[in-house]
């Protein structure tokens, strides 16, 4: 296995600013993103947002740690790139689209290269399970988090 990733979207019954408030608060990810075990801020910007974080993820075959640098483009794009970690490379983003009528489309994109050793562990059905957890599930998790806060 070389690269792993993909893109998935969900339409959320909330305005873009409410969705952005959850997306940009990266330190609460363990509260609503499955597989995110821990996250801690190593650097912050002038607006006190975490810009460099260490993340521990449970990717089914083992726990992996990565240091990720975030770039904020409020209120529609949060992107990241791995600077150091157990994986060979990771890039990703959340892109929010205002659909009007207090609705937002959230698209999650992830591209990762687990490297040779970890890649040998992630094959076949395991690869499908990892992709489902790390990519396909994310928009639904965000939808559930945002819509539950609006109640």
Q: Which residues make up each language-model segment?
A:
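Glycine-rich portal/gate segments that line the openings of hydrophobic small-molecule binding cavities
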Residues: 30, 40-84, 136-151
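Beta-strand/loop substructures that line and gate deep hydrophobic ligand-binding cavities in soluble
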Residues: 81-133
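Short strand-connecting beta-turns/loops that link adjacent beta-strands
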Residues: 15, 46-48, 75, 99-103
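Short, surface-exposed coil-to-beta transition loops
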Residues: 5-7, 63-67, 88-93
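A structural signal for short, well-ordered beta-strand segments
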Residues: 6-12, 55, 94, 108-110
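Hydrophobic pocket/interface hotspot
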Residues: 18-23, 29, 53, 106-108, ...
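Short amphipathic alpha-helical segments
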Residues: 15-18, 130, 134, 138
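Hydrophobic ligand-binding cavity/cleft-lining segments
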Residues: 1-48
């Amino acid at each position: 296995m070389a690269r792993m990733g993909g893109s998935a979207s969900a339409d959320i019954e909330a305005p873009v600013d409410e969705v952005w408030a959850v997306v940009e608060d990266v330190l609460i990810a363990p509260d609503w993103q499955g597989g995110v075990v821990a996250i801690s801020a190593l650097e912050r910007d002038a607006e006190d947002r975490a810009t460099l974080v260490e993340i521990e993820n449970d990717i089914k075959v083992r726990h992996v740690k990565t240091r990720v640098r975030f770039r904020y483009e409020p209120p529609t794009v949060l992107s990241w790139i791995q600077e150091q970690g157990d994986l060979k490379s990771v890039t990703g983003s959340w892109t929010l689209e205002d659909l009007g009528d207090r609705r937002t489309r959230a698209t999650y994109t992830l591209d990762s290269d687990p490297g040779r050793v970890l890649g040998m562990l992630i094959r076949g059905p395991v690869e499908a399970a990892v992709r489902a957890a790390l990519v396909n599930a994310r928009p639904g998790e965000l939808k559930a988090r945002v819509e539950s806060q609006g109640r």
